[in-house]
Amino acid sequence: MKTLIKRLQDQQDIWKRIEIVGDIVIIGVPFNKKPEDLVEIANEILSTFPYVKSVWGRHRDVNGTYRLSTYVHLAGEKRSETVYKEHKCKYFLDFTKVFFSEKLSYEHLRVATQVKRDEIIINMFSGFGPFSILSAVLGRPKIVYSIDLNPYAYYYMMVNVELNKAYEVLPIYGDAFKRIYELEDADRIIAPLPELADKAYEVALQKVKKGGIIHLYTEVETNKGEDPVRIAMNKYRGSYFGRIVRSVNPHKYHVVVDIKAN
Protein backbone atom coordinates (compact mmCIF):
# COMPACT_ATOMS: atom_id res chain seq x y z
CA MET A 1 0.00 0.00 0.00
CA LYS A 2 2.94 2.38 0.69
CA THR A 3 3.99 1.96 -2.96
CA LEU A 4 0.60 3.13 -4.17
CA ILE A 5 0.56 5.99 -1.69
CA LYS A 6 3.87 7.26 -3.10
CA ARG A 7 2.36 7.15 -6.57
CA LEU A 8 -0.54 9.26 -5.33
CA GLN A 9 1.57 11.96 -3.67
CA ASP A 10 0.28 14.49 -6.18
CA GLN A 11 -3.29 13.59 -5.17
CA GLN A 12 -3.04 14.03 -1.41
CA ASP A 13 -6.78 14.58 -1.08
CA ILE A 14 -7.19 10.93 -2.13
CA TRP A 15 -4.38 8.93 -0.54
CA LYS A 16 -4.93 10.49 2.87
CA ARG A 17 -8.48 9.11 2.75
CA ILE A 18 -7.58 5.45 2.16
CA GLU A 19 -8.56 2.96 4.87
CA ILE A 20 -7.94 -0.80 4.90
CA VAL A 21 -10.69 -2.88 6.50
CA GLY A 22 -9.75 -6.54 6.38
CA ASP A 23 -9.46 -7.41 2.68
CA ILE A 24 -11.40 -4.31 1.61
CA VAL A 25 -10.12 -0.81 0.85
CA ILE A 26 -12.30 2.23 1.48
CA ILE A 27 -11.49 5.55 -0.21
CA GLY A 28 -13.05 8.69 1.18
CA VAL A 29 -14.59 10.62 -1.73
CA PRO A 30 -13.15 14.17 -1.78
CA PHE A 31 -15.58 17.09 -2.00
CA ASN A 32 -14.31 18.00 -5.46
CA LYS A 33 -14.67 14.52 -6.98
CA LYS A 34 -17.37 12.00 -7.87
CA PRO A 35 -17.13 8.28 -7.03
CA GLU A 36 -16.58 7.41 -10.69
CA ASP A 37 -13.43 9.55 -10.63
CA LEU A 38 -11.91 6.98 -8.25
CA VAL A 39 -12.56 3.85 -10.34
CA GLU A 40 -9.15 3.96 -12.05
CA ILE A 41 -7.37 4.17 -8.69
CA ALA A 42 -9.60 1.40 -7.32
CA ASN A 43 -8.65 -0.94 -10.17
CA GLU A 44 -4.97 -0.09 -9.68
CA ILE A 45 -5.26 -1.05 -6.01
CA LEU A 46 -6.79 -4.41 -6.96
CA SER A 47 -4.10 -5.17 -9.54
CA THR A 48 -1.24 -4.13 -7.24
CA PHE A 49 -2.35 -5.79 -4.00
CA PRO A 50 -3.70 -9.34 -4.40
CA TYR A 51 -4.95 -9.46 -0.80
CA VAL A 52 -7.41 -6.63 -1.54
CA LYS A 53 -10.63 -8.12 -2.88
CA SER A 54 -12.93 -5.09 -3.02
CA VAL A 55 -12.71 -1.30 -3.16
CA TRP A 56 -15.43 1.11 -2.05
CA GLY A 57 -15.89 4.86 -1.97
CA ARG A 58 -17.26 6.56 1.12
CA HIS A 59 -18.99 9.93 1.19
CA ARG A 60 -18.16 12.15 4.14
CA ASP A 61 -21.76 12.34 5.34
CA VAL A 62 -22.95 10.41 8.41
CA ASN A 63 -26.72 10.10 8.45
CA GLY A 64 -29.63 8.67 10.37
CA THR A 65 -30.16 7.13 13.77
CA TYR A 66 -27.43 4.57 13.18
CA ARG A 67 -24.81 7.12 11.96
CA LEU A 68 -24.12 5.35 8.67
CA SER A 69 -22.07 6.76 5.82
CA THR A 70 -23.06 6.41 2.17
CA TYR A 71 -20.86 3.92 0.30
CA VAL A 72 -20.40 3.31 -3.43
CA HIS A 73 -18.84 0.13 -4.83
CA LEU A 74 -15.89 0.98 -7.10
CA ALA A 75 -14.16 -2.28 -8.08
CA GLY A 76 -13.67 -5.94 -7.22
CA GLU A 77 -16.10 -8.11 -5.29
CA LYS A 78 -19.34 -6.36 -4.43
CA ARG A 79 -18.98 -7.34 -0.80
CA SER A 80 -18.93 -5.13 2.30
CA GLU A 81 -18.67 -7.81 5.00
CA THR A 82 -15.17 -8.60 6.24
CA VAL A 83 -12.99 -9.36 9.26
CA TYR A 84 -11.17 -6.30 10.56
CA LYS A 85 -8.14 -6.67 12.84
CA GLU A 86 -7.37 -3.98 15.40
CA HIS A 87 -4.87 -4.26 18.25
CA LYS A 88 -5.34 -7.75 19.73
CA CYS A 89 -8.86 -8.30 18.42
CA LYS A 90 -10.75 -9.39 15.30
CA TYR A 91 -14.11 -7.95 14.30
CA PHE A 92 -16.61 -9.35 11.83
CA LEU A 93 -18.64 -6.47 10.38
CA ASP A 94 -20.42 -4.94 7.43
CA PHE A 95 -19.32 -1.31 7.27
CA THR A 96 -22.42 -0.36 5.26
CA LYS A 97 -24.67 -1.48 8.13
CA VAL A 98 -22.74 -0.40 11.24
CA PHE A 99 -20.79 2.73 12.10
CA PHE A 100 -17.10 2.23 11.35
CA SER A 101 -14.13 4.58 11.60
CA GLU A 102 -10.50 3.50 11.60
CA LYS A 103 -9.72 6.90 13.15
CA LEU A 104 -11.13 5.64 16.47
CA SER A 105 -8.48 2.91 16.75
CA TYR A 106 -6.30 4.97 19.09
CA GLU A 107 -9.28 5.81 21.29
CA HIS A 108 -10.26 2.15 21.58
CA LEU A 109 -6.79 1.38 22.94
CA ARG A 110 -6.53 4.51 25.10
CA VAL A 111 -9.76 3.73 26.92
CA ALA A 112 -9.13 -0.02 27.16
CA THR A 113 -5.73 0.44 28.81
CA GLN A 114 -7.37 2.44 31.61
CA VAL A 115 -9.79 -0.34 32.52
CA LYS A 116 -9.09 -2.09 35.82
CA ARG A 117 -9.83 -5.67 36.79
CA ASP A 118 -13.37 -6.28 38.08
CA GLU A 119 -14.73 -2.90 36.97
CA ILE A 120 -18.37 -2.58 36.00
CA ILE A 121 -18.52 -0.79 32.63
CA ILE A 122 -21.41 0.55 30.57
CA ASN A 123 -20.88 1.33 26.89
CA MET A 124 -23.91 3.36 25.86
CA PHE A 125 -23.35 3.18 22.09
CA SER A 126 -21.37 0.01 21.43
CA GLY A 127 -21.65 -0.51 17.69
CA PHE A 128 -20.03 -3.78 16.60
CA GLY A 129 -18.05 -3.84 19.85
CA PRO A 130 -14.53 -2.37 19.51
CA PHE A 131 -14.51 -0.30 22.72
CA SER A 132 -16.20 -3.03 24.76
CA ILE A 133 -14.31 -6.05 23.48
CA LEU A 134 -10.82 -4.56 23.67
CA SER A 135 -11.61 -3.29 27.18
CA ALA A 136 -12.62 -6.83 28.16
CA VAL A 137 -9.55 -8.42 26.58
CA LEU A 138 -7.02 -6.02 28.10
CA GLY A 139 -8.63 -5.01 31.38
CA ARG A 140 -10.58 -8.07 32.50
CA PRO A 141 -13.46 -6.10 34.02
CA LYS A 142 -16.29 -7.83 35.87
CA ILE A 143 -18.76 -6.98 33.11
CA VAL A 144 -19.16 -4.63 30.15
CA TYR A 145 -22.81 -3.81 29.45
CA SER A 146 -22.80 -2.98 25.73
CA ILE A 147 -25.91 -1.27 24.39
CA ASP A 148 -26.84 -0.45 20.81
CA LEU A 149 -30.04 0.48 18.99
CA ASN A 150 -28.88 -0.80 15.59
CA PRO A 151 -29.95 -4.46 15.18
CA TYR A 152 -27.03 -5.13 12.84
CA ALA A 153 -24.57 -3.71 15.37
CA TYR A 154 -26.12 -5.91 18.05
CA TYR A 155 -25.76 -8.98 15.81
CA TYR A 156 -22.12 -8.29 14.93
CA MET A 157 -21.32 -7.50 18.56
CA MET A 158 -22.61 -10.93 19.61
CA VAL A 159 -20.52 -12.59 16.90
CA ASN A 160 -17.44 -10.62 17.94
CA VAL A 161 -17.83 -11.53 21.61
CA GLU A 162 -17.53 -15.18 20.55
CA LEU A 163 -14.77 -14.47 18.03
CA ASN A 164 -12.60 -12.86 20.71
CA LYS A 165 -13.82 -14.97 23.66
CA ALA A 166 -14.63 -11.69 25.41
CA TYR A 167 -17.31 -13.17 27.62
CA GLU A 168 -17.24 -10.25 30.05
CA VAL A 169 -19.14 -8.32 27.37
CA LEU A 170 -22.94 -8.50 27.60
CA PRO A 171 -24.61 -7.22 24.38
CA ILE A 172 -27.90 -5.38 24.97
CA TYR A 173 -30.24 -4.38 22.15
CA GLY A 174 -32.21 -1.17 22.55
CA ASP A 175 -32.18 2.54 23.33
CA ALA A 176 -29.33 3.33 25.73
CA PHE A 177 -31.28 6.19 27.28
CA LYS A 178 -33.89 3.66 28.42
CA ARG A 179 -31.95 0.42 28.89
CA ILE A 180 -29.25 2.02 31.03
CA TYR A 181 -31.70 2.46 33.91
CA GLU A 182 -32.14 -1.33 34.06
CA LEU A 183 -28.44 -1.74 34.89
CA GLU A 184 -26.37 -1.44 38.03
CA ASP A 185 -24.25 1.68 38.51
CA ALA A 186 -20.90 1.62 36.73
CA ASP A 187 -17.28 2.35 37.56
CA ARG A 188 -16.77 3.52 33.99
CA ILE A 189 -19.15 4.71 31.26
CA ILE A 190 -18.21 5.09 27.59
CA ALA A 191 -20.41 7.41 25.51
CA PRO A 192 -19.00 7.51 21.93
CA LEU A 193 -21.84 9.34 20.16
CA PRO A 194 -20.81 13.00 19.68
CA GLU A 195 -24.18 14.16 18.35
CA LEU A 196 -25.90 13.16 21.61
CA ALA A 197 -23.13 14.11 24.02
CA ASP A 198 -25.14 16.53 26.18
CA LYS A 199 -27.93 14.04 26.82
CA ALA A 200 -25.46 11.19 27.34
CA TYR A 201 -23.53 13.28 29.87
CA GLU A 202 -26.61 13.95 32.00
CA VAL A 203 -27.65 10.29 31.95
CA ALA A 204 -24.13 9.00 32.61
CA LEU A 205 -23.82 11.22 35.69
CA GLN A 206 -26.86 9.41 37.12
CA LYS A 207 -25.43 5.93 36.51
CA VAL A 208 -21.72 6.30 37.27
CA LYS A 209 -20.43 5.63 40.77
CA LYS A 210 -18.85 8.40 42.83
CA GLY A 211 -15.25 8.66 41.70
CA GLY A 212 -16.08 6.79 38.49
CA ILE A 213 -14.99 7.80 35.00
CA ILE A 214 -17.01 8.92 31.97
CA HIS A 215 -15.38 8.90 28.52
CA LEU A 216 -17.57 11.40 26.64
CA TYR A 217 -17.25 12.08 22.90
CA THR A 218 -18.67 15.41 21.80
CA GLU A 219 -18.90 17.84 18.86
CA VAL A 220 -17.32 21.27 19.22
CA GLU A 221 -17.72 24.20 16.84
CA THR A 222 -15.08 26.91 17.07
CA ASN A 223 -14.33 30.40 15.91
CA LYS A 224 -10.87 31.28 14.62
CA GLY A 225 -8.23 30.88 17.30
CA GLU A 226 -10.41 28.96 19.76
CA ASP A 227 -9.23 25.68 21.30
CA PRO A 228 -11.90 22.96 20.88
CA VAL A 229 -10.47 20.87 23.71
CA ARG A 230 -10.59 23.78 26.15
CA ILE A 231 -14.18 24.56 25.11
CA ALA A 232 -15.26 20.96 25.75
CA MET A 233 -13.46 20.67 29.08
CA ASN A 234 -14.99 23.91 30.31
CA LYS A 235 -18.46 22.73 29.30
CA TYR A 236 -18.50 19.39 31.10
CA ARG A 237 -17.96 19.55 34.84
CA GLY A 238 -15.33 17.16 36.17
CA SER A 239 -13.26 17.02 32.96
CA TYR A 240 -9.60 16.31 33.64
CA PHE A 241 -8.37 15.27 30.16
CA GLY A 242 -9.32 16.05 26.58
CA ARG A 243 -8.06 15.56 23.04
CA ILE A 244 -9.20 16.08 19.46
CA VAL A 245 -10.32 12.80 17.92
CA ARG A 246 -10.79 14.16 14.41
CA SER A 247 -11.60 17.28 12.43
CA VAL A 248 -15.05 17.22 10.83
CA ASN A 249 -14.50 20.48 8.94
CA PRO A 250 -12.31 23.57 9.51
CA HIS A 251 -14.50 24.78 12.38
CA LYS A 252 -16.02 21.57 13.79
CA TYR A 253 -14.24 18.87 15.78
CA HIS A 254 -14.98 15.62 17.53
CA VAL A 255 -13.39 15.84 20.97
CA VAL A 256 -13.17 13.32 23.80
CA VAL A 257 -13.17 14.42 27.43
CA ASP A 258 -12.51 12.15 30.38
CA ILE A 259 -14.64 13.12 33.37
CA LYS A 260 -14.34 12.07 37.00
CA ALA A 261 -17.66 11.98 38.82
CA ASN A 262 -17.66 13.65 42.22
UniProtKB/Swiss-Prot annotation:
Q: Which reaction does it catalyse?
A: 4-demethylwyosine(37) in tRNA(Phe) + S-adenosyl-L-methionine = isowyosine(37) in tRNA(Phe) + S-adenosyl-L-homocysteine + H(+)
Residues involved in S-adenosyl-L-methionine binding: H108, F125, D148, L149, D175, A176
**Which Gene3D superfamilies would you find in this protein's record?**
Met-10+ protein-like domains, Vaccinia Virus protein VP39
Report the enzyme's class at the first EC level.
transferase
Q: Which GO terms describe its cellular component?
A: cytoplasm
One GO term under biological process is:
tRNA N1-guanine methylation
Top-level lineage group: Archaea
Gene Ontology molecular function terms on file = tRNA methyltransferase activity
Q: Which InterPro entries match?
A: MeTrfase_TRM5/TYW2 (IPR030382), SAM-dependent_MTases_sf (IPR029063), TRM5-TYW2-like_MTfase (IPR056743), TRM5/TYW2-like_N (IPR056744)
Annotated EC: 2.1.1.-
What's the main place this protein lives?
cytoplasm
What keywords does the record list, in alphabetical order?
Cytoplasm, Methyltransferase, S-adenosyl-L-methionine, Transferase, tRNA processing
- Key word tRNA processing present: yes
Q: Where in the cell is it found?
A: Cytoplasm
The similarity annotation says: Belongs to the class I-like SAM-binding methyltransferase superfamily. TRM5/TYW2 family.
Q: Which NCBIfam families does the annotation name?
A: tRNAMtaseTaw21
Its biological purpose: Catalyzes the C7-methylation of 4-demethylwyosine (imG-14) at position 37 in tRNA(Phe).
Q: What is this protein called?
A: tRNA 4-demethylwyosine(37)-methyltransferase Taw21
- Source species: Saccharolobus solfataricus (strain ATCC 35092 / DSM 1617 / JCM 11322 / P2)
